[in-house]
């Protein structure tokens, strides 16, 4: 009698355990299916705008890229064979875009994502950058001065060539007064370009600017502090 009572008590416990396991199993299966619904079953890539989920006639969904690879001609029609159930789906004109989208997955893809705000803390004011690195400003100034010297020399060469042409061709084309006026104007422009070309370069080469001296002093102090 004791054995029969023990068996009768153990049967409800085991039945409750089975019901618990069966109740828990669908929940786990549903979460796994939800994760699988968000990625293609062929390439295992998550759905996105280039990989839109497309439904076949068998209601199985795959990404558009995999369906393009599975597209073939059967009986003179474009069709796709489902990789899961092997059911054939006709594709009008061979256009994957003609297939219906998986609305549930597309709705999840259309949900707005949290935007990450970037704070450009590394950006500083150009004035602060110039104050922190005066050597860069000095180099830029020297480059501008050298470019101005080159432009002035080219202008002087062009004006000299123009003056020579006027002196050579002027007696045959222009009268005396106009010829001398043009010659005077070109000579004055040539003199000004020569002054702009020569004087700043000699001054800059002989006398260094205060900014250059300040940069050198900072370099020497920086080297001494490191030593």
Curated annotation (Swiss-Prot):
It is found in: Endoplasmic reticulum membrane. InterPro entries: RING_finger_E3_ubiq-ligases, Znf_RING, Znf_RING/FYVE/PHD, Znf_RING_CS. It is a multi-pass membrane protein. Polyubiquitinated. 'Lys-29'-linked autoubiquitination leads to proteasomal degradation. Keywords: Endoplasmic reticulum, Membrane, Metal-binding, Transferase, Transmembrane, Transmembrane helix, Ubl conjugation, Ubl conjugation pathway, Zinc, Zinc-finger. Coiled coil: none annotated. SUPFAM superfamilies: RING/U-box (SSF57850). Interacts with BNIP1. E3 ubiquitin protein ligase that is part of an apoptotic signaling pathway activated by endoplasmic reticulum stress. Stimulates the expression of proteins specific of the unfolded protein response (UPR), ubiquitinates BNIP1 and regulates its localization to the mitochondrion and induces calcium release from the endoplasmic reticulum that ultimately leads to cell apoptosis. Plays a role in the maintenance of intestinal homeostasis and clearance of enteric pathogens. The RING-type domain is required for ubiquitination. This is E3 ubiquitin-protein ligase RNF186. The lineage of its organism: Eukaryota, Metazoa, Chordata, Craniata, Vertebrata. The gene is RNF186.
């Amino acid at each position: 009698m004791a054995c029969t009572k023990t068996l009768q008590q153990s049967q409800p416990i085991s039945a409750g355990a089975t019901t618990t396991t069966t109740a828990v199993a669908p929940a786990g299966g549903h979460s796994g299916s939800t994760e699988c619904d968000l990625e293609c079953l062929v390439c295992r890539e998550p759905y996105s705008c280039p990989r839109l989920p497309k439904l076949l006639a068998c209601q199985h969904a795959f990404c558009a890229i995999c369906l393009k690879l599975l597209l073939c001609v059967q009986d003179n029609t474009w069709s796709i064979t489902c990789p899961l159930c092997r059911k054939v789906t006709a594709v009008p004109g061979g256009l994957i875009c003609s297939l219906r989208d998986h609305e549930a997955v597309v709705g999840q893809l259309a949900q707005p994502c949290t935007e990450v705000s970037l704070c450009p803390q590394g950006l500083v004011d150009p004035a602060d950058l110039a104050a922190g690195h005066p050597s860069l400003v000095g180099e830029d100034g020297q480059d501008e001065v050298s470019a101005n010297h080159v432009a002035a020399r080219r202008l002087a060469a062009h004006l000299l060539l123009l003056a020579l042409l006027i002196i050579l061709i002027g007696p045959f084309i222009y009268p005396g007064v106009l010829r001398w006026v043009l010659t005077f104007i070109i000579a004055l422009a040539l003199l000004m370009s020569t002054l702009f070309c020569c004087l700043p370069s000699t001054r800059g080469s002989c006398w260094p600017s205060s900014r250059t001296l300040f940069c050198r002093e900072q370099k020497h102090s920086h080297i001494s502090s490191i030593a």
